[in-house]
Amino acid sequence: MTDLTTHDLAQPGWQTRDHLDDPVVGELCNRFGPDAFTVQATRTGIPVVWVKREQLLDVVAFLKKQPKPYVMLFDLHGMDERLRTHREGLPAADYSVFYHIISIERNRDIMLKVALAESDLHVPTVTKLFPNANWYERETWEMFGITFNGHPHLTRIMMPHTWEGHPLRKDYPARATEFDPFVLTKQKEDLEMESLTFKPEEWGMKRGTENEDFMFLNLGPNHPSSHGAFRIILQLDGEEIVDCVPDVGYHHRGAEKMGERQSWHSYIPYTDRIEYLGGCVNEMPYVLAVEKLAGIEVPDRVKTIRVMLSELFRINSHLLYISTYIQDVGAMTPVFFAFTDRQKIYDLVEAITGFRMHPAWFRIGGVAHDLPRGWERLLREFLDWMPSRLDTYVKAALQNTILKGRTQGVAAYNAKEALDWGVTGAGLRATGIGFDVRKWRPYSGYENFDFEVPVGDGISDCYSRVMLKVEELRQSLRILDQCLKNMPEGPFKADHPLTTPPPKERTLQHIDTLINHFLQVSWGPVMPANESFQMVEATKGINSYYLTSDGGTMSYRTRIRTPSYAHLQQIPSVIRGCLVSDLIVYLGSIDFVMSDVDR
């Protein structure tokens, strides 16, 4: 599973390290020479290596060909470096592009960075090495104006095609009040309507062959089977899908831009809405990444409470996924079962946090308040109720021969294809790779829990993905039972000046302790200048936050990597040659919501 040593796992997450002892750094230096790189010390927990633009493709190709290769492009994006003041020892750069690549066999990551001058914002595309770089490069061009030479279709992806400017540049306004008043003239309205006219050539499609014309069909953005504001343009020969193009961005809210104008604390409610079904699961990577920046170790009680809430929301999300998946195939009853079961979870979550879907309850250094009296009874009642209900879902619907006939062998892909497209979560594990962050890279005390990671037999299809989620539900119930029986005693927040007001008795003795409290409450906590990273096993795959602090009260750069974005990009490669009815089943089996895609 991993070649991480006990020493690696024992290192504090908040320790600033250059990771020169990581084998991959030595391999790169032996191949390209030590002068080819600048190694950056961060709190990301992985090697961060600046490479020269002209060597980028060679370095990436080298990493892919190693005995234990780096096979998944996990993330790719950019940063406007122009206003960053703490850049000691780094290459001169107005902008930078980073490439986060994972080796499954090593269970290790590396982040490559390329420095760019404002006068020459060009970098070669890596789409020939990693096909999933396509969407990431399009978004980076759109947000920063960085051109990827050789990209097959470098167009806007999140914003309308008529949009002007690059929103994540530091000189781009962050609030509507900073723009000129919006006026929709007749000319502008006509221009906007004209831009919506469908032209196959603009999407890389052919109108037809020498002997026949293709039919083009819009599925969405208001179709019940598209699971949100999501459009897929289908190129059809009869009912067979010749090609298709996913069209995303309708739900884009500028979540990463918002991170640059909210304090470290006040951004927490926004994290709930990245994947609006995941609740506290979405808060976890953000608060852990901020705690790395601050150097905060939280009490064991906090870790266990966070795990408990995360698993409750995981079950809640999985139940909705399984029931709507069955509904997409044609059965209604499980949906009503699921909402009954999910109501019990919401009652429990509301009793603990005070809210239901979006509690914004995790805090930097702890949680908002301690567990209420009676939480054990509510959790025990749910744990007694749920296992038999799961059996009902399986017997009533998932073992149905019609459902199996509609889903087995449909939209199937293997492990290599999953890694090429950046697939994580159940979609990857169904191919036989048991990569679950809770097991492979434990966080928040998951290493103390006894649970299994369900793994498929080598092929991920619509049926295997949903059955894996059923088994994951059983494992989450197992984790919750351990939380109930082994909840540690102790405080529900860390005693740290960046996050927690001092006790009153201390302020009565030392008035200077109020200085920190005054600053944190009025301006927000000031985080040390550094970079941190945290990935978690979210409800739909791996979710991560990559934070850059410039020593201020707000994040200099907040990068959010979501699993659904990668999963939707994979759709054309899987569904070509299938029928439209197969696409409906495939969409239901992915488990996505558009807020997770569009951010």
From Swiss-Prot:
Q: What is its EC number?
A: 7.1.1.-
Query: According to its record, what are the GO cellular component terms?
Result: NADH dehydrogenase complex; plasma membrane
Q: Catalyses which reaction?
A: a quinone + NADH + 5 H(+)(in) = a quinol + NAD(+) + 4 H(+)(out)
Sorted UniProt keywords: Cell inner membrane, Cell membrane, Membrane, Multifunctional enzyme, NAD, Quinone, Translocase, Transport, Ubiquinone
* Location, primary (coarse class): membrane
**Membrane topology per record:** Peripheral membrane protein
Q: Which domain of life is it from?
A: Bacteria
Which purpose does this protein serve, as stated in its record?
A: NDH-1 shuttles electrons from NADH, via FMN and iron-sulfur (Fe-S) centers, to quinones in the respiratory chain. The immediate electron acceptor for the enzyme in this species is believed to be ubiquinone. Couples the redox reaction to proton translocation (for every two electrons transferred, four hydrogen ions are translocated across the cytoplasmic membrane), and thus conserves the redox energy in a proton gradient.
UniProt family annotation: In the N-terminal section; belongs to the complex I 30 kDa subunit family.
Q: What is this protein called?
A: NADH-quinone oxidoreductase subunit C/D
Identify the species of origin.
Pectobacterium carotovorum subsp. carotovorum (strain PC1)
User: Which gene does this sequence derive from?
Assistant: nuoC
